[in-house]
Amino acid sequence: MTQKRRNNGRNKHGRGHVKFVRCINCSRAVPKDKAIKRWTIRNMVETAAIRDLSEASVYSEYTIPKLYIKLQYCVSCAIHSRVVRVRSREGRRIRTPPPRVRYNRDGKKVNPTAVAKNL
């Protein structure tokens, strides 16, 4: 039988069984090593209330704590919500993560390779 991926779409190497997690979108049971995982980091307080909190705070340099949320998707929901994209047969072999889009202070896109050359 032909093999679509080198890791069979999983990260289970050498383990017999892996516990299941639930997809946050459809609640499907997905093996933990197969689930597509993403972290979102948000402020605990919405942006409109940050200024009010800083004015009312006794501490001058109080940093508002952040929420670290782990999102776990099944493969079909991750593709549907464009968390991951379908790649060609040659593209699937590329194991390096895609280049991240960076923005400068003006809000313009910055090419990461050009920035690395300047340093």
Curated annotation (Swiss-Prot):
Localization, UniProt: Cytoplasm
Q: Which UniProt keywords apply?
A: Cytoplasm, Ribonucleoprotein, Ribosomal protein
- Kindly report the protein's main subcellular placement as a broad class: cytoplasm
Q: Where is this region: Disordered?
A: 88-119
* MF-aspect GO terms: mRNA binding; structural constituent of ribosome
Q: Which GO terms describe its biological process?
A: cytoplasmic translation; ribosome biogenesis
Database matches in PROSITE patterns: RIBOSOMAL_S26E
List GO terms (cellular component aspect).
Answer: cytosol; cytosolic small ribosomal subunit
Assembly information from the UniProt record: Component of the small ribosomal subunit (SSU). Mature yeast ribosomes consist of a small (40S) and a large (60S) subunit. The 40S small subunit contains 1 molecule of ribosomal RNA (18S rRNA) and at least 33 different proteins. The large 60S subunit contains 3 rRNA molecules (25S, 5.8S and 5S rRNA) and at least 46 different proteins. eS26 interacts with eS1 forming part of the mRNA exit tunnel. eS26 interacts with TSR2.
Primary role = Component of the ribosome, a large ribonucleoprotein complex responsible for the synthesis of proteins in the cell. The small ribosomal subunit (SSU) binds messenger RNAs (mRNAs) and translates the encoded message by selecting cognate aminoacyl-transfer RNA (tRNA) molecules. The large subunit (LSU) contains the ribosomal catalytic site termed the peptidyl transferase center (PTC), which catalyzes the formation of peptide bonds, thereby polymerizing the amino acids delivered by tRNAs into a polypeptide chain.
Miscellaneous comment as given in the Swiss-Prot or TrEMBL entry:
There are 2 genes for eS26 in S.pombe.
PANTHER family, from UniProt? Answer: 40S RIBOSOMAL PROTEIN S26 (PTHR12538:SF0)
Family membership: Belongs to the eukaryotic ribosomal protein eS26 family.
Protein name stated in the entry: Small ribosomal subunit protein eS26B
Question: What gene is this protein a product of?
Answer: rps2602
